[in-house]
Amino acid sequence: MATRLQYDNNNCEIGVFSKLTNAYCLVSATSASANFFTGYESKLKGVIPIVTTSIGGSGTIGSLCVGNKNGLLLSHTITDQELQHLRDSLPDEVVVQRIEEPICALGNAIACNDYVALVHPKLEKDTEEIISDVLGVEVYRQTIANNELVGSYCSLSNNGGMVHSNTNVEEMVELANLVQVPLVAGTVNRGSQVISAGLTVNDWTAFCGSDTTAVELSVVNNIFKLVQSQPDFVGSEMRKSLIDTYV
């Protein structure tokens, strides 16, 4: 089930300061709030590693990276020390790579699950190839509701996806055919259309900004097929996700 969280000083844009996948979770090292880290820890401890980090000294790590169970791509602003910290902290099977892309806010420009990535139409060709190789995904250049920042206006798991609330039916059908999961047009944080800023999700759990309403939370739980997390369920889903990649 989805859990409400907030960053420092009642900031509900939790996705800007964290990144959640089926193999790991990254949390901003600059947060002064212990509750932000422990919120993730309460659902993920003992299941996947939770790593605190910054990228180029910035706490807005969710905006500056993109990843899935196969890999993690980081903005060119990341320092050598930060890069080595992540390589040392994440599972050996996760490929961690810095990418020399002019659009440094990778999390805003790319939305992905473990199989497909939707990307900003103006990404460099080399970047597209690196995304495909490192994340192990099919890559599609797209817009969502006429917005090029597809990573901001879409969140995906292997079970479903949520997109900008102004996405029309024809576009929803096209996007669903590309990503091969059910989609819903929705909001988080009491009407925010910047989906990924207020939502982090993987195949068995999700975290939403603290302003997310009960109705919005219900939509998240339904589209991403989240159930009441129990140890056996979480463990089996995590193992299945990792085995798919590493065997």
From Swiss-Prot:
Keywords noted in UniProt: Cytoplasm, Initiation factor, Nucleus, Protein biosynthesis, Ribosome biogenesis
Family matches, as CDD domains: IF6 (cd00527)
Protein biosynthesis among keywords: yes
UniProt-annotated location(s): Cytoplasm; Nucleus, Nucleolus
Phenotype on disruption: Causes embryonic lethality.
Classification via SUPFAM superfamilies: Pentein
GO annotation, cellular component aspect: cytosol; nucleolus; nucleus
Primary localization: cytoplasm
Molecular function terms from GO: ribosomal large subunit binding; translation initiation factor activity
Family: Belongs to the eIF-6 family.
Primary role: Binds to the 60S ribosomal subunit and prevents its association with the 40S ribosomal subunit to form the 80S initiation complex in the cytoplasm. May also be involved in ribosome biogenesis.
Subunit details: Monomer. Associates with the 60S ribosomal subunit.
Name under which the protein is recorded: Eukaryotic translation initiation factor 6-1
Species in which this protein is naturally found: Arabidopsis thaliana (Mouse-ear cress)
Phylogenetic placement of the source organism: Eukaryota, Viridiplantae, Streptophyta, Embryophyta, Tracheophyta
